[in-house]
Amino acid sequence: MKKFALATIFALATTSAFAGFNGNNSQGGFQQAAPAAISVKQALSAADNSMITLVGNITQQIDDDEFWFTDGTGQIKIEIKKRVWNGLNVDSKDKVKIYGKLDNEVFEKAELDVLRIEKAE
């Protein structure tokens, strides 16, 4: 009798463990709006580590992941890692929107580390 009671208690106790968790299924997180696009001229004088959005054209490839970018107000060197491209193909005629972190050291020219790139509308 004790064995039967013990087995029953064990069976009832473990059924809730096998039920699974069905909690919050929403994909959460804070969605901040991207910063408004500024000109290259403004970006060249912005503070180091600023998050910048630019709209313009990639005019020339310098290295594997370095390019010249212009919007008509100035020119800035940008760095786009291969993973950031995400299958996007552009040429110098395509207008693109880039989001990145400005690297503006005191004794060096400003450079933008691109975190996201997309074709501009």
From Swiss-Prot:
It comes from the Bacteria. Disulfide bonds: none annotated. It is found in: Periplasm. InterPro entries: BOBF_sf (IPR036700), BOF (IPR005220), Ca-regulated_OB-fold (IPR052401), YgiW/YdeI (IPR016052). GO terms for cellular component: periplasmic space. Residues 1-19 form the signal peptide. Keywords: Periplasm, Signal. To E.coli YgiW. This is Uncharacterized protein HI_1709. The lineage of its organism: Bacteria, Pseudomonadati, Pseudomonadota, Gammaproteobacteria, Pasteurellales.
